[in-house]
Amino acid sequence: MTANVDGVPEKFATLGLTYDDVLLLPGASEVLPNAVDTSTLISRNVRVNIPLLSAAMDKVTEARMAIAMARQGGVGVLHRNLSIEDQVNQVDLVKRSESGMVTDPITVHPDATLGEADALCAKFRISGVPVTDPAGKLLGIVTNRDMAFESDRSRQVREVMTPMPLVTGKVGISGVEAMELLRRHKIEKLPLVDETGVLKGLITVKDFKKAEQYPNAAKDAEGRLLVGAAVGASPEALDRAQALASAGVDFLIVDTSHGHNSNALDWMAKIKSSVGVDVIGGNVATRDGAQALVDAGVDGVKVGVGPGSICTTRVVAGIGVPQVTAIYEAALAARAAGVPVIGDGGLQYSGDIGKALAAGADSVMLGSLLAGCEESPGELMFINGKQFKSYRGMGSLGAMQSRGQGRSYSKDRYFQAEVSSDDKLVPEGIEGQVPYRGPLANVLHQLVGGLRQTMGYVGAASVDEMESKGRFVRITSAGLKESHPHDIQMTVEAPNYSRK
């Protein structure tokens, strides 16, 4: 057996490092943390304002989390443990949550009942809807105020709506002009109509207020919040991808446990050629794996095999690469091709984000750090007087089981789609709980604040400079112990630190 210069057999020569194995060296710096640029590309054509994505997991990201992530400048990736219709509806909820102008507003027919109109308002969290005829001509508007004191929910909308003429705007109106009309007439909604009176859009005062409230929000060219979605690698995935693209999703992630698999690569290429949005491939953990994704034509590479807190792939299958090394190796292939890298999993502290970026990632995907947030879909539990939220891996039994519904949308991620009986599944994840952490905005404030401090220490004014200027020192177990608070009993907890 051949050996390297240290006498280690070549087969065992690679040293794998993860976040706790390294620290970043402080460097000469003229950079102030509050002046750094945290924007980055997560794929060839999608840019966010902070380098954070919420994971495509059913206890982490649905519409509420995706909306909150985009408002803070990041982006959420909707999980795929849903039917195609339900996942498309999640995209629609995000895209309709706010926009510069709603180009396809929800409308109601004048013969609809108040109960039906109220249900629409509740579903999309809106305060009113335009009333149109079958040809799309604007007839009036019905709002919560019109319906508030109507006890008979079977009455028709035409009986209580505010009919035309309404204050309207022309298609192409500027934001300044629209705001002036809203202010002058003391209204909250401005329908936009063409010369024949057909409804073409809707501008609301709520969207102007949200733009002021969330100035760092990540938005598309139409002023709508960014959102991504996960799909699999199967014939069903092609239908799912096309439906999601039609719904306005900004990018797709072909989400498999082993992206360096010929079947997965074939489906990535097929999906990429059939949709008009960026496609990110994953997951891989080697340079060769990343190169295979690049060769398949993906717009982004997602890195991570087994680093997540709820993942058991490394012990069940004996497979994986410690995450810092995995990111570094994958970036050698991806960066040369101009393809952004996403480090997925294994992050415990804000300092790990900077380490991932210095290793070669353009952004990171977070699961456990966000699972305890108010906006996550996990169940809230009280245990011994403390609050927790449920969290699980997508390879856990709970995520892969069909539960009598005849279909699971998660099994194929781990190449077990053909397993017909739940008791024959081989899980690669666990189920558990994480402490409740409150609103996402507070959590991201600490994470991004920690990243800004990292960039200041390194002397990196941008995310790109983190990779070029970041230098590592490998540490021992004693060095790791020294890095954490020690020789003291902590009496007041910090919002950004807890001993794991």
Question: Model regions: which residues?
Answer:
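Active-site-adjacent beta->alpha loops and helix N-cap segments on the catalytic face
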Residues: N34, S83-D92, E150-S154, S174, ...
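Bateman/CBS regulatory modules and CBS-like beta-alpha motifs in cytosolic regions of diverse proteins
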Residues: N34-V48, A55-M57, D86-I126, V131-D133, ...
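Catalytic cores of alpha/beta
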Residues: R64-I67, D239-S246, A285-V303, G343, ...
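Glycine-rich phosphate-binding active-site loops on the catalytic face of alpha/beta enzymes
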Residues: R71-D86, V249-N261, D299-A317, L347-M381
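Terminal amphipathic helices with adjacent charged low-complexity linkers/tails
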Residues: R80-K95, V131, A135-S151, L182, ...
